[in-house]
Regions:
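Charge-dense, low-complexity intrinsically disordered segments
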Residues: 121, 154-157
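Mid-to-C-terminal "cap/lid" subdomains and adjacent gly/pro-rich loops that border
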Residues: 1-81, 136-142, 158-161, 165-169, ...
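C-terminal structured subdomain/cap of oxidoreductase catalytic cores
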Residues: 1-16, 56, 85-145, 164-215
């Protein structure tokens, strides 16, 4: 399993974001400011805020958002001009499960990794709901006066199908993979509750691959 990240990108009326600050000469000045004083944009993280929401589970939050004061499309893989900020959302407990399979009998061949994002209908429902919640946040009077327009998915994406088409094109990995080496006591468990690999002495696995599911 892994979290898939859905984003809403907006253009601001004024240049109040980090967009363009990664280019010379600004990036050089920011680097010097950090090196000499330990301050400035280079001393900050790209995610400046966040929060949790109840999407479907009323007992505990199941959606998480992050606010980045820059236009970060597909984890930075896609560049669009202008300036603004990004709010991304993640459904915390996805039901879709992927797979990791051997490509061949050769240990040097990379494995076949299929995260199988959005395979479960509930995951698709929550991804769409997260975009609608972000839009609701952006419509609040404390923030809406700063916004010139929604750039992605854009005002034309209104129906569930239109929003899902955007998510499938622009959704990105949240880098939280788990479950390829699960911990447990059943026959399919790779490690026991002490993180010891079953059937092999003096070998433990201690990274997030031991988590059976995302929680």
């Amino acid at each position: 399993q892994d979290h898939i990240c859905t984003n809403v990108h907006v253009q601001t009326k004024e240049r109040i974001s980090y967009d363009g600050h990664d280019k010379l000469p600004r990036s050089l000045l920011h680097g010097l400011q950090w090196l000499l004083y330990g301050s400035g944009p280079a001393a900050a993280v790209i995610v400046e805020g966040g929060g949790f929401f109840h999407g479907d589970d009323k007992t505990r939050p199941d959606l998480q958002i992050h606010v980045a004061p820059a236009t970060v499309v597909r984890g930075g893989q896609t560049q669009i001009p202008g300036f603004g900020f990004t709010i991304n959302s993640t459904f915390l407990r996805p039901r879709s499960r992927g797979s990791v399979r051997l490509r061949s009998s050769s240990p040097v061949d990379e494995p076949l990794v299929d995260p199988n994002y959005l395979d479960d209908p509930h995951d698709r429902k929550m991804a769409i709901k997260s975009v609608r919640i972000i839009r609701e946040v952006l419509s609040q009077p404390s923030i809406s006066p700063l916004i010139a327009e929604e750039r992605l998915p854009g005002p034309s994406a209104e129906t569930d199908d239109e929003i899902m088409a955007y998510i499938r094109q622009y959704g990105c990995c949240d880098y939280h993979p788990v479950g390829t080496c699960k911990m447990g006591v059943d026959d399919l468990a790779v490690v026991d509750p002490e993180l010891r690999v079953r059937g092999i002495e003096n070998l433990r696995v201690i990274d997030s691959s031991i988590m059976p599911v995302l929680t």
